[in-house]
A protein has these predicted regions:
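Single-pass transmembrane signal-anchor helices and their membrane-water interface zones
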Residues: 1-17
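Polar, acidic low-complexity tracts enriched in Ser/Thr/Gln/Glu with frequent Gly/Pro and Thr-Pro motifs
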Residues: 12-176
Length: 176
């Protein structure tokens, strides 16, 4: 009985959501990830993200493999190129240190993919904290919470901009 309880506890730990990783170019998608950095689910937030996912089933895949596959699909489908070369990586985790570590790891992974494809890309990264306001904006505009957070930061610096005008833009266009 003791071993059975331990087995169930270990299974739950390996299959519980530990982090949420969001990737935004103009395709916006989100991945829930276990503490062992396995993808539990992938949610596309717009049609472009559905194109990127295609028929890929990334559930159970190592996070690095999933990120490589998604970046590869973005390159192949023209969402990332020499002209459109910025990607936003957002990480949400209750543990700030783990969030920062995962954010840096993913930035390094994506930079390696860019270098392998001879692409001069820009990886913007941030840690986000879930809030009802951000969730509502993300849902309203069909974007990730990470992109909603970036847009709020841009608007805070330039009050002449509006959320509605920035939401449909690519990360590359927002970063300019």
């Amino acid at each position: 009985m003791c071993c059975g309880a331990f087995g169930i506890s270990s299974w739950r730990g390996a299959n519980a959501v530990d982090s949420v990783v969001m990737l935004d170019v103009n395709p916006s998608l989100s991945m829930t990830v276990s503490s062992k950095e396995r993808v539990l689910s992938v949610t596309p937030f717009n049609q472009d993200a559905e194109v990127i996912l295609g028929d890929m089933d990334l559930t159970g895949t190592d996070l690095d493999v999933a990120v490589n596959a998604l970046i590869g699909s973005m390159l192949q489908n023209g969402y990332l190129s020499d002209i459109q070369n910025a990607i936003l990586v957002s990480v949400e985790n209750q543990d700030a240190a783990k969030s920062a570590q995962l954010q840096q790891h993913l930035t390094d992974t994506i930079n390696s993919v860019f270098q392998g494809g001879s692409l001069e890309g820009a990886v913007l990264s941030q840690t986000v904290t879930e809030s009802a306001d951000l969730n509502a904006l993300a849902q309203q505009y069909g974007i990730s919470v990470g992109k909603a957070s970036l847009i709020q930061e841009v608007i805070a610096q330039d009050s002449t901009l509006t959320f509605a005008s920035l939401a449909p833009l690519s990360v590359n266009e927002i970063a300019l």
